[in-house]
Regions:
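PRPP-associated nucleotide enzymes
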Residues: 1-187
Length: 187
């Protein structure tokens, strides 16, 4: 698909940054097997490109978070749920997600995966949005850091209607991905 005008991060810029991240991860792996845990749906495009840049044996696992609103004794709260994760005891683990915003979901996943006693566990994200953070969590690797609270579309991230994941570049709504409103026909 062709590039959209106003891309904040071009396909070439993303590719160069992902290649650099792959080299950094490879250096730290020292040739050891790396278990990559990819968060669905957002992390798969970034993870695929990143894994191809890692010079070490890689095993890929996928997890999906489910966030539910739970009410108990009249108090509402949000809870994060994951299915059973892979067996990671003694393994080097890299959790890959597209965006680190509040950090709540990633922190929960890191704690949950840490229960299986991996040798090491690290977090890689394409976009780090520290201004949105609600927990004390920093990524070990990040592609780009942004102060924008805009919705990002492309390179695996979808617009509200689910489209745009296939775009090679990454754009925020402020940079030209805002969709035109479609008026329905009057009956």
């Amino acid at each position: 698909m062709s590039s959209r005008k106003g891309a904040a991060y071009s396909a070439a810029r993303i590719a160069a940054r992902v290649a650099a991240l792959g080299k950094e991860v490879s250096r730290e792996c020292e040739g050891r097997r790396l278990d990559v845990v990819v968060t669905l749906d957002r992390g798969f495009v970034f993870a695929a490109d990143l894994m191809r840049q890692i010079d070490a044996p890689v095993v890929c696992h996928f997890v999906r978070a489910e966030v539910r609103d739970v009410e108990q004794s009249g108090h509402a709260r949000r809870e994060v749920f994951f299915g059973s994760g892979p067996e990671l005891k003694g393994r080097d683990v890299l959790v890959v997600d597209a965006v680190l915003e509040s950090g709540v979901t990633q922190e929960f996943l890191l704690r949950r995966l840490g229960e299986s006693k991996p040798r090491s566990i690290r977090l890689a994200v394409l976009l780090d949005k520290p201004a949105s953070r609600r927990v004390a969590l920093e990524p070990d690797y990040f592609g780009f850091r942004t102060a924008s609270n805009q919705v990002w579309v492309g390179y695996g991230l979808a617009a509200a209607n689910g489209t745009g994941r296939n775009l090679r570049q990454l754009s925020s709504e402020a940079n030209g991905t805002r969709r035109k409103s479609v008026k329905g026909r009057k009956k």
